[in-house]
Amino acid sequence: MLEKDIEAYLVKRVKSVGGRAYKFVSPSNRGVSDRIVCLPDGTTHFIELKRPGGKVSPLQDMFAREMALLNQSYDILWSKEEVDKWISDHTSTTPQIFCSPATAP
């Protein structure tokens, strides 16, 4: 399985739970995560995707440590199964209803 397949699967799964998975490209900052995931509960997560057997570069490792120091959520996912587990761990099983303040009960 290729990294791009796992990445496409992450995007699809995040959308299926009402979130967004933005491609993160920062030309002057190599090593940043592949995606920034924003979930409906208001949380933001930095996600690096790797194919099984892939390697984390020293710059990616440095970015992971920086995110930890900043108390940010950072994960490396290595397969579609790990994507599914990550989604399960980070989303509620209770449906969430969002409305504007004007229509709130």
Go through each PLM region and give its residues.
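Catalytic phosphate/metal-binding cores of nucleic-acid and nucleotide-processing enzymes, i.e., regions
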Residues: 1-105
